[in-house]
Design a protein with these regions (language model features):
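Charged, often low-complexity linker/regulatory segments
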Residues: 1-50, 266
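Short, basic/polar, glycine-containing "phosphate-handling" surface segments that engage DNA
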Residues: 2-13, 74-84, 89-242, 312-333, ...
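Short, hydrophobic/amphipathic alpha-helical patches that form generic packing surfaces
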Residues: 32, 242-259, 337-338, 447-454, ...
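Active-site metal-binding core of divalent-cation-utilizing nuclease and nuclease-like domains
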Residues: 41-81
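Flexible, glycine-/basic-rich loop-and-beta segments that form/coincide
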Residues: 140-150, 629-671
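Segments forming glycine/polar-rich beta-alpha architectures that bind adenosine-containing cofactors
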Residues: 232-265, 269-274, 656-671
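Long recognition/docking surfaces used for binding and targeting
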Residues: 257-344
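SAM-dependent methyltransferase catalytic region
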Residues: 322, 327, 331, 341-611, ...
């Protein structure tokens, strides 16, 4: 049962006895609610009712953390001050906002610096602002009046369905409000929590004001926010998730860039989300953010206060500690992955979005670099200016940064090339490309590439009145569409920045001689953004399956299959030569449904290598052939199970001058 449902049932039952006092009788129900939520946090937070007088009066309760308790004792250590603040409880008939302004709460605040005020139906946090002054922070309202509250309590399941997710997220944030905020993963959790609140506010709300933006996004990205028969709302869910990701990662990106500009200013300087657009360098994200952050769009959806809370959260981050971790190259593992898992785990699963371990990224890029030298007679490998690279599903930019790092190492090894950093920057601008369809990872990819170049001493130039700013070759687009020239006049988009993004991405697709395509394509079938142009990529893998091979039931719907089709047909067909290196679902190696696909690989490529990493929960039970444990290679500290499907790394080379018989090799490994 949901914690809110339990709480409402308990307060309803207490009131129904007719013997309850207006306030104190409900303390146990409130404590149960807070303890149920508090035990899910790390460290856990425990509510203790009726605290001793420490010089400011007798708080109705306090929120403690484990280190404040004696071992094996339910009582706090003598003299322990509640680490997460105290609680002031009033009856449901009283006004929590008036209580928060009273002398008693001010006395508590003067001693404890954080007070949660509640009348059972309203919850209001009194904390401190950047200057250390008393201020009302976040609030949550379960019902507008006492009468409405008791009606809601009489229908606990219905009320919990309407409020449960947002309310529990609110309580978690309250209990974490006084905790030090230094680690990227903790900041990510708060950002995701606010984003979830925002997403819940716009679910089911008509968004006619955003129809123009929706149509422009579909045109710019080369996709349709479509539903399916099984889930008609799937595309709408993706669209709304895209909007929320854009708003919150736009704010986050602006905060990061604002910090870079204020390194030498007073640590007490404050970031303001309303000025975020001034700090965003990527035109597409800047335009999206500007459209979404207009008061006419935010205020009717109730998103202004959520963004105000987000601003307060970012302003209490210890920036020195945060950025010492963030810029060590762990931004993705410790920030984006926890964000997406906490924000929208369903979308993450639908799109098959998983963090790629750095060991895999390093291995694949190194293999590609070696094959360029050995198979295509390019002694400088990735550093050769004729080598154009594309990660068609670049996510947060891990492969792009590793390509640039490898490129820089080659230039340095040639004798300390004095222009090495400049040449790496030139590559990032003009021949190392990434495509991404989700705004949040797209923003992080730009941040990662930008930080890498900055650390090399070749930062991207910012926009000035006299010149256009520089940006990495990472584009927000559907990688699977837009490769063919339009049959009619190109549609003009309402927003120039979106048109510029679309046109730049299409220039890469149609005009750049892509030689290397690598990455970690999505694994799962996701029809929420399907387009007819995508399905054409898979058709060659179905030819003859029924008539020639007698395979009547087959499944080629997973997105990674489309990316193989893209690499084989679109890119190899355009340039006559290509190197493909993907880590993907390993089903294509042996599943009967993929027999035509395997035969096409053997006919279309000259050299092929496959590293089977196993790790499948269904086929191998996550065991090696020797019976040893075989966890997924995608297991991380924050996702210990990894993914269920087995994986494989492919490396396939097609040369302009074809060989008669392809060379192939394979290996089987755990992981």
């Amino acid at each position: 049962m949901h914690p809110l449902e339990i709480y409402l049932k308990e307060v309803h039952d207490i009131r129904a006895t007719g013997a309850a006092t207006p306030e104190t009788a409900y303390y146990p129900a409130l404590a149960n609610l807070l303890n149920e939520v508090g035990k899910t946090l790390k460290p856990k937070v425990k509510c203790i009712i009726s605290l001793k007088n420490r010089g400011a009066g007798l708080p109705d309760g306090g929120l403690f953390t484990p280190e404040q308790f004696q071992k094996s004792s339910p009582k706090p250590l003598p003299g322990a001050t509640p680490a997460r603040g105290v609680i002031e409880v009033k009856s449901a008939s009283e006004d929590a906002w008036l209580t928060a302004e009273g002398e008693q709460v001010s006395r508590y605040w003067g001693k404890y610096r954080q007070v949660l005020v509640t009348n059972l139906r309203d919850f209001l946090l009194v904390g401190q602002d950047a200057e250390g002054s008393q201020v009302k922070l976040e609030a949550y309202r379960l019902a507008d009046s006492e009468a409405d509250f008791w009606k809601a309590a009489a229908q606990p399941r219905k009320t919990a369905a309407a409020h449960g997710e947002r309310f529990v997220e609110y309580l978690k944030r309250i209990m974490l409000q006084a905790a030090p905020l230094t680690a990227p993963k903790d900041v990510a959790w708060f950002l995701a929590s606010y984003a979830r609140d925002a997403k819940a506010r716009i679910e089911g709300v008509a968004l006619p004001a955003l129809d123009t933006l929706r149509n422009a996004l579909e045109e710019a990205l080369g996709l349709k926010f479509e539903g399916t028969k099984a889930d008609p709302d799937k595309g709408e869910h993706f669209f709304r998730s895209t909007l929320v990701q854009t708003i919150f990662y736009g704010v986050f990106s602006a905060w990061v860039l604002w910090h870079k500009k204020h390194l030498h200013l007073n640590p007490k300087d404050r970031f303001h989300w309303r000025e975020a657009a001034w700090h965003l360098h990527v035109p597409m994200i800047k335009a999206l953010f500007e459209q979404l952050s207009l008061p006419s769009k935010l205020e009717p959806l109730g998103l202004v206060e959520v963004l105000d809370w987000t601003e307060t959260c970012l302003n209490r981050v210890s920036r020195a500690d945060f950025f010492s971790h963030f810029e060590e190259g762990h931004a993705v593992q410790y920030f984006y992955e926890p964000f997406l898992e906490a924000f929208d785990p369903k979308l993450r699963k639908d799109l098959g979005v998983w963090y790629t371990p750095p060991e895999i990224v390093h291995y694949m890029v190194a293999r590609v670099d070696a094959v360029l030298r050995q198979e295509l007679d390019l002694p400088d490998g990735l550093a050769d200016p004729r080598v154009y690279v594309l990660d068609p599903c670049c996510g947060t930019g891990a492969y792009l940064v590793e390509v640039l790092r490898r490129l820089h190492a080659t230039l340095q090894a040639r004798g300390g090339d004095g222009l090495a950093a400049h040449k790496v920057k030139l590559a990032a601008l003009s021949r190392v490309f990434g495509f991404e369809i989700m705004p949040a990872p797209f923003v992080v990819a730009h941040l990662q590439v930008g930080l890498f170049l900055q650390n090399l001493g070749a930062p991207l130039a910012e926009e000035t009145p006299a010149r256009k700013g520089e940006r990495a070759g990472v584009y927000l687009t559907n990688a699977l569409t837009g490769w063919e020239p339009p049959t009619g006049p190109k549609k003009q988009l309402l927003f120039p920045e979106m048109q510029e993004e679309r046109d730049a991405a299409e220039e890469v697709k149609r005009d750049k001689p892509i030689l290397v395509i690598l990455g970690n394509p999505p694994y799962n079938a996701f029809a929420g953004v399907s387009a007819a142009a995508e399905k054409i990529l898979v058709e060659p893998y179905k030819e003859g399956l029924v008539k020639k091979w007698g395979i009547k039931k087959f499944n080629l719907d997973d997105l990674y299959v489309r990316f193989f089709g893209l690499a084989e047909r679109r890119i190899a067909g355009m340039t006559g030569k290509v190197i493909v290196s993907f880590i993907s679902n390993f089903s294509y190696l042996g599943d009967p449904s993929f027999v035509v696909m395997r035969r096409r690989f053997l006919s279309e490529f000259d050299s092929l290598w496959f590293d089977c990493l196993n790790g499948d929960s269904r086929e191998t039970g996550k065991l090696t052939p020797e019976g040893k444990p075989d966890p997924s290679v995608f297991s991380t500290e924050y996702n210990k199970e990894g993914i269920r499907v087995g994986t494989a790394v492919c490396l396939m080379v097609r040369q302009k001058k074809r060989r008669g018989t392809p060379r192939s090799a394979s290996g089987i490994f755990g992981g």
